[in-house]
From Swiss-Prot:
Residues 1-25, 237-268 are annotated as: Disordered. A motif (Lysosomal targeting motif) lies at residues 242-244, 409-419. The keyword Transmembrane helix applies. Residues 436-438 form a propeptide. The modification Phosphoserine is found at S12, S14. This is Battenin. A motif (Lysosomal targeting motif. Required for AP1G1, AP2A2 and AP3D1 interaction) lies at residues 253-254. Highly glycosylated. Farnesylation is important for trafficking to lysosomes. Pfam families: CLN3. A lipid is attached at C435 (S-farnesyl cysteine).
Length: 438
């Protein structure tokens, strides 16, 4: 990886001299590199997903009729706003927040579909640079937008940044000890929590959405600094005892007679080998698709319709709280891998579908009387989604050979994007149907 700092002091090659070894220096160097990479991947996960999360948290503001031109003087309505659609029992925008979801996810889907075919031919450093530039551009474009269409173009830039970054950094984990996957996953969960919480907090404090978005321009700069200045060279990594212990318990996902090789050879895999690896990955891809379909159908199809009038929170504030609590659950579970390892992720998919059915029934029948019960369900929803993500990639890292791991990571990261895209496509007509109910 050309962009990572990785100079190392060589040991003396002098012969004939017996010197007293200093075994603690290499150990300290190894520990220092371990923590630099751990922090580096955590920050990369945080920065990569930050713009994506902020755009979803701002979805109601992007589409709201209560915004003024330029997003410069947004004022939250009172606790009982006049419905946008007076003939509906819901307080609906003319366009579902799923429209923002689709703009925030479809470019990512295209990138992830094409990534296994040839993205590995492009060096990592240019990919990271493009990702950072797109993230910064998304904040600026949405902040200064005077129309929903222009704002959605900014959301598309955030999607390109997040999608390109995710497939790049997950592939990059193949060159480092498997422990960095846990740090990356925790960072992406942190992006959800900090992104939603920062947008909620700054707008609650009185900043306009424009000022809030412009205040976040330091995040893309932090992403570039984490990659180019913090990560050590992967060639210097030594997996160590933890890796050996994990490999002894590994159950191969792909049966092969070929000996394992060092990661980095995915570009030499034949189409037949890629297809064989892909078929083995379906056991993990399908449940992750289902989990993300269910949770984002809730987030972008139902959040806007779960509106309680018997509370001091306005509709926009309720939507931001939903997003923040969901992301808090995601962060907690994505950071829990060392405490709880789940092999059978199908169970998480089933539980998430039950969440969807329950909240959809509440939207239809309106039997929940307190917003705080919905808060608990949404927090639980986030816990399930985060656990599915981190355990899926951890299981794949354990059960694929080194020569297949880079390709497997790049391929599996399409799972969440595919599920989110399907949920957005179905949430749009559902929104229109429910908002026409009197």
């Amino acid at each position: 990886m050309g962009g990572c700092a990785g100079s190392r002091r060589r040991l003396s090659d002098s012969e004939g001299e017996e010197t007293v070894p200093e075994p603690r220096l290499p150990l300290l160097d190894h520990q220092g590199a371990h923590w630099k990479n751990a922090v580096g991947f955590w920050l990369l996960g945080l920065c990569n997903n930050f713009s994506y999360v902020v755009m979803l948290s701002a979805a109601h503001d992007i589409l709201s009729h209560e915004r003024t031109s330029g997003n410069q003087s947004h004022v939250d309505p009172g606790p009982a706003p006049i419905p946008h659609n007076s003939s509906s029992r819901f307080d609906c925008n003319s366009v579902s927040t799923a429209a923002v979801l689709l703009a925030d996810i479809l470019p990512t889907l295209v990138i992830k579909l094409l990534a296994p075919l040839g993205l590995h031919l492009l060096p990592y450093s240019p990919r990271v640079l493009v990702s950072g530039i797109c993230a910064a551009g998304s904040f600026v474009l949405v902040a200064f937008s005077h129309s929903v269409g222009t704002s959605l173009c900014g959301v598309v830039l955030a999607s390109i940044s997040s999608g390109l970054g995710e497939v790049t950094f997950l592939s990059l984990t193949a060159f480092y000890p498997r422990a960095v996957i846990s740090w990356w996953s925790s960072g992406t969960g942190g992006a959800g929590l900090l992104g939603a919480l920062s947008y909620l907090g700054l707008t609650q404090a009185g900043l306009s959405p424009q000022q809030t978005l412009l205040s976040m321009l330091g995040i893309p700069a932090l992403l570039l600094a984490s990659y180019f200045l913090l990560l050590t060279s992967p060639e210097a990594q030594d997996p160590g005892g933890e890796e050996e212990a994990e490999s002894s318990a590994r159950q191969p996902l792909i049966r092969t007679e070929a000996p394992e090789s060092k990661p980095g050879s995915s570009s030499s895999l034949s189409l037949r080998e890629r297809w064989t690896v892909f078929k083995g990955l379906l056991w993990y891809i399908v449940p992750l698709v289902v989990v993300y379909f269910a949770e984002y159908f809730i987030n972008q199809g139902l959040f806007e319709l779960l509106f309680f009038r018997n509370t001091s929170l306005s509709h926009a504030q309720q939507y931001r709280w939903y997003q923040m609590l969901y992301q808090a659950g995601v962060f907690a579970s994505r950071s829990s891998l060392r405490c709880c390892h789940i092999r059978f992720t199908w169970a998480l998919a089933l539980l998430q579908c039950l969440n969807l059915a329950f909240l959809l029934a509440d939207v239809w029948f309106g039997f929940l009387l307190s917003i705080y019960f919905v808060f608990l369900i949404i927090l639980y929803e986030g816990l399930l989604g985060g656990a599915a993500y981190v355990n899926t990639f951890h299981n794949i890292a354990l059960e694929t050979s080194d020569e297949h791991r880079e390709f497997a990571m790049a391929t599996t990261c399409i799972s969440d994007t595919l599920g989110i895209s399907l949920s957005g496509l179905l949430a749009l007509p559902l929104h229109d149907f429910l908002c026409q109910l009197s």
